[in-house]
Amino acid sequence: MFIGPTGVPIPPPEYATLANLLYVHANNPNQALPILYTPEELYPITGVKSLTLNQSVSEGLTILGNYIQNQITNGPVTVFGYSQSAIISSLYMQQLAAQGFPISPADLNFVLVGNEMNPNGGMLARFPNLTLPTLGLDFYGATPSNTPYDVAIYTQEYDGFADFPRYPLNFISDLNAVVGIATVHTKYLSLTAAQVNSAVQLPTSPGYYENGGKTYYYMIPTEELPLLMPLRAIPVIGNPLAALIEPNLEVIVNLGYGDPNYGYSTSYADVQTPFGLFPEVSPSTLIDAFANGTRQGIQDFHTELQALATQPIEFPTFTPPQPADLIATLSNLPSPEKIVNTAATVISTDYAVLLPAADTALAFATSLPLYDSQLFLEQLVQGNIVNAIGYPIAADVGLVTIAGIVQFLVISKAISQNISDIRALIP
């Protein structure tokens, strides 16, 4: 049974086909792949009138529970969850755990991708016990790792929702991750089978599988840093410049996860791992990593320049407008009424952006100071003065970066709508 991600309440058949081909591998040639409707809304990303995450997840959780109870008598159920539906699936596992796992392990299993509740990397697990009431957003914690059900969780490296840095004081790493929300998190069904098959199985705590653990965690490598995608988009020189700086920038980004060689936390995947302050990396390791990165960057830059030299130069063509075209354009100009209506629509769209901005500001003015004070007191009681001061700062850096990308997405959506409305006026 296939559930959509945020913004896709009713996935098309192609969605289920791809998800099955890449991740689930159900072999039912004579049966249609079942699709389950859930709200999949997320204020403000899916719109200023959308349900909040808490509301959408709550409704989805009820729908999923009812579906499984109705279907379980007909045979085993496999749940495929992506992004928000991975959250719903994780919370359903929590419900089953609280009930003593009433459903037989032979009758239920899960395949999750882009899971914001990954124990070690999920954004909702990195900042435990945080709630933002003005945004209707609770940080739910981690997907249970102690269920008797077979669970496979796939994550792409640098997916900011499912693979958020462990050390958020590293702003560059945070920024790369939040760019990855738009460029990596949305691409799980765009991968090839070879890319999915290249996934690395992540380590779990000693004895996890021997003691009955049944959740398998996989990391799919991402070839290029999301942070450099805007640079690569620059014609001609973009790719060479990105190739030059990427190896060393990757070291900096990866330090946000704890190891300059990996864009994900290499500690146990089944253990909820909250954010920390500084990674434990020796100076010699850093020196070697930057030295190797510098050599690799120069080599890649040279390779890109050689490839650039072999490409023919193409000049743009220009066709001057003809008088007949100008006359036709003038005759099709929009009416004053249409211009006024479009202006009103644009103003309304832009005004709507202010509401989520105000809610975010209120959350940062109320909920965040409370969270910071809790972090401070927890560390102070433990006698750790450095963490008492550093943890609130690290949390703020990470959360402000997340809020920034959310506002950017909201504003970008409004600008896109404005452009579409204005284009409709042009004959």
Model-derived regions, located:
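Active-site catalytic motif of lipid deacylating hydrolases and related acyltransferases
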Residues: 1-76, 118-122, 154-157, 164, ...
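Lipolytic serine-hydrolase domain surface
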Residues: 13-21, 25-50, 122-264
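Serine-dependent carboxylesterase/thioesterase catalytic core
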Residues: 61-158
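Residues at beta-strand starts and edge strands
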Residues: 106, 212-214, 269
